[in-house]
């Protein structure tokens, strides 16, 4: 089963992306993606 999660930028805390995640994984998702407000690639973490 997969569930929808929201990713937020670590620098500006803006919620830019949403993605799907497997429910069996316990750790939070961390992906390097482009942030429109920072105008650069930053680490995006899964929010609650």
Curated annotation (Swiss-Prot):
Keywords: Ribonucleoprotein, Ribosomal protein. GO terms for cellular component: cytoplasm; ribonucleoprotein complex; ribosome. The keyword Ribosomal protein applies. This is Large ribosomal subunit protein bL33A. One of its GO terms (molecular function) is structural constituent of ribosome. The keyword Ribonucleoprotein applies. GO terms for biological process: translation. The lineage of its organism: Bacteria, Bacillati, Bacillota, Bacilli, Bacillales. HAMAP family: Ribosomal_bL33 (MF_00294). InterPro entries: Ribosomal_bL33, Ribosomal_bL33_sf, Ribosomal_zn-bd. Belongs to the bacterial ribosomal protein bL33 family. Pfam families: Ribosomal_L33. It comes from the Bacteria.
């Amino acid at each position: 089963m997969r569930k929808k999660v929201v990713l937020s930028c670590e620098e500006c805390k803006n919620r830019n992306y949403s993605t799907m995640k497997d429910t069996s994984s316990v750790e939070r998702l961390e992906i390097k993606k482009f942030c429109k407000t920072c105008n650069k690639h930053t680490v995006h973490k899964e929010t609650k």
